[in-house]
Swiss-Prot record:
GO terms for molecular function: rRNA binding; structural constituent of ribosome. It holds the Pfam family Ribosomal_L6. The gene is rplF. GO terms for cellular component: cytosolic large ribosomal subunit. This is Large ribosomal subunit protein uL6. Transmembrane segments: none annotated. Belongs to the universal ribosomal protein uL6 family.
Length: 177
């Protein structure tokens, strides 16, 4: 029995949810998000709550139950509050600069890295070592943050690179003579 799946998703005021043709559409103050629904799970919009239950008692349906409830909750949270990830850049000469729909990164390569910002994502650089990625789609925000981080992952000796705010970098000691 999924303990996460049993809890109903509450819909705050100003948010509407509709189910049509196997697609859940959630509209809120920040925008609109959709989710393709699985056949193994039944979804019910009941007033200001969305109930997620397995359609039949198979192992596969129970496996998707909690995940589908969380995906629905992510849609509701996205259209009301949005999601933000913050990246911190550490290293001499490492910088970031948001220029319109591009993020320009200087990461110690012989060239600058130009990262095009996808649709639905907003990138800000409050200072040249901090990158704030925000949007309404949790998956897309995390994906963009991971793609930016991939250009220069933090290394364990000096900690240089791009890391998430609050991420712990396991440090190693250098060679001893």
């Amino acid at each position: 029995m999924s303990r996460i799946g049993k809890r109903p998703v509450t819909i705050p005021s100003g948010v509407t949810a509709n189910i049509a043709d196997g697609v859940l559409t959630v509209k809120g103050p920040k925008g609109t998000l959709t989710l393709t629904l699985r056949d193994e799970i039944s979804y019910t919009v009941d007033g200001d709550t969305i109930l997620v239950k397995p359609a039949n008692d198979t192992k596969g349906a129970r496996a998707f139950w909690g995940m589908q409830r969380t995906l629905v909750d992510n849609l509701v949270t996205g259209v009301t509050q949005g999601y933000t990830k913050v990246l911190e850049i550490t290293g001499v000469g490492y910088r970031a600069n948001a220029q319109g729909k591009n993020l320009k990164l200087q990461l110690g390569y012989s060239h600058d890295v130009d990262f095009p910002v996808p649709e639905g994502i907003e990138i800000k650089t409050p200072d040249n070592t901090t990158v704030e990625i925000s949007g309404i789609d949790k998956q897309k925000v995390g994906q963009v943050a991971a793609e930016i981080r991939r250009w220069r992952k933090p290394e364990p000796y000096k900690g240089k690179g791009i890391k998430y705010r609050g991420e712990f970098i396991f440090r190693k000691e250098g060679k001893k003579k």
